[in-house]
Regions:
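Primarily secretory-pathway and cell-envelope proteins
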Residues: 21-86, 135-196
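Positively charged n-region of N-terminal signal peptides that target proteins for export
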Residues: 1-4, 20
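N-terminal signal peptide c-region/cleavage motif recognized by signal peptidases
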Residues: 14-16
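Sec-dependent signal peptide hydrophobic core
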Residues: 5-12
């Protein structure tokens, strides 16, 4: 009985002490506002378009050149044309994701309605290859080639001016259009058609 009374007393005392703790004080009315949150280095972006009446989107993170002109796509650059590690997530952070509400032909790859991960093979600096991969939810540099739905060559060009932040773009004109990737002094595009 003594132990029961001691335990009950301890529980009561602990409850009383915890109830007396002060809540954090709110800042005084003249206190400066807290510092604004820092913008992410590679902010999330989304390109959208309609081809053949089907909504298409590409979700990606957009890194910036940030004073590294001429140092992005070089032998020892940020995104190197290294034949031993040629596949690029074509963005930053999580892998770039394509979502389509309808069946498409992207270049010569049949892409059924659904969600996919996009990679770009840049081992040949003059001829990039778009890779449509069935495995989604990847982070960073993870790539499983056994999950490729297909690969298609991209048309290379130079943008009219330096592209500071990586950008995907979807342009649709009825049942056809283009998907374009541009960053720094590189631009690569691929034709897209609604698949019947």
């Amino acid at each position: 009985m003594k132990h029961l009374l001691v335990c009950a007393g301890l529980v009561f005392a602990a409850t009383t002490v915890l109830a007396q703790q002060n809540a954090p004080a709110s800042p005084p009315p003249n206190a400066p506002a807290s510092a604004p949150k820092k913008a992410p280095a590679s902010p999330p972006e989304k390109a959208t378009g309609t081809i053949g009446g089907h909504e298409i989107s590409i979700s990606y993170s957009s890194p910036g050149v940030k004073g590294r002109e001429g140092k992005i796509f070089t032998k020892d650059g940020l995104i190197s044309h290294n034949p031993h590690y040629p596949v690029w997530r074509a963005g930053a952070n999580g892998a770039t994701t394509l979502e389509t509400a309808g069946d498409l032909m992207i270049g010569d790859v049949h892409v059924p309605a659904g969600k996919y991960t996009l990679f770009v093979d840049i081992s040949d600096p003059d001829q990039w290859t778009l890779i449509v991969n069935k495995k989604t939810g990847e982070w960073g540099l993870a790539y499983d080639g056994s999950q490729d739905l297909g690969k298609t060559k991209m048309q290379m060009s130079k943008p009219s001016s330096m592209v500071e932040n990586l950008k995907w773009d979807i342009k649709g004109d009825g049942g056809k259009g283009t998907i374009t990737l541009a960053w720094e002094d590189h631009e690569a595009s691929v034709p897209v058609m609604a698949h019947k």
